[in-house]
Amino acid sequence: MKKVLVINSNPKPTEMSFGLRLGEHYLTTLQADADVQIERVNLYEENIPLIDGTVLDAWGKAAAGEALSAEQTSTLGRMNEILEQFIAADVVVFITPMWNLSFPTLLKAYIDNVVIAGRTFKYTAEGPKGLLGGKKVVHIEARGGIYSEGPTTGLRFTDTYLQTIMGFIGITDYENVFVEGMAATPDRAEEILASAKQRAEQSAKNLLAAVK
């Protein structure tokens, strides 16, 4: 059975979000296969530790073999839970909005919990090497403007960063399924979503065919 981990970084209700509606259509297609197990994580409903002074101090103490405080033990334990869940997945689906040319803060916090030296990448004489080859990442993204073509293509920092950081930990099988332009042409928003749903459905079918 293939494990699909879905990371939702949008706080809106599904019906209020083009990205979440697109994501649900994608996941509905996947769920048609009984050999797929889907696990969902809503970053706005979970405890996602930030890398702060407490965490940095805890890492230093752990490396030196020193005792951790109860708070540090709890925080590092939670970070390890997040990491193990990510490592156990065969496919990771990120559902994100583009906010101010980036994505929500909690997604960056989540990524900081799974990009861990010695676990998901390692340092070598030739440079960093990713350790999570063999997985697939699907990035389902909603953008109000047009960023897939024209003069704004270089501003697609959300997608380029996520693809780069996933490649850094060894996941090079990466796909971006996007819906865009709803704010630029609100009168066509539902039409745009319908077209994106067709692409998302085909993407999900391709994934199912590939993992058979």
Residue spans of the language-model regions?
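Short, well-ordered alpha-helix to beta-strand connector turns
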Residues: 89-90, 134, 171
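Short, glycine-/small-residue-rich phosphate/pyrophosphate-handling segment
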Residues: 123-168
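Cofactor-binding loop segments of dinucleotide-utilizing enzymes, especially the Rossmann-like FAD-
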Residues: 9, 142, 179
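Hydrophobic residues at beta-strand termini and immediately following loops
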Residues: 41, 140, 177
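Flexible, glycine-rich phosphate/dinucleotide-binding loops
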Residues: 13, 47, 146, 183-185
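Glycine-rich phosphate/pyrophosphate-binding loop and the adjoining helix
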Residues: 149-212
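Residues at the starts of beta-strands that form the adenosine-phosphate
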Residues: 3, 37, 135-137, 173
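N-terminal beta1-alpha1-beta2 submodule of the flavodoxin-like/Rossmannoid cofactor-binding fold
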Residues: 1-96, 101-105, 109-112, 116, ...
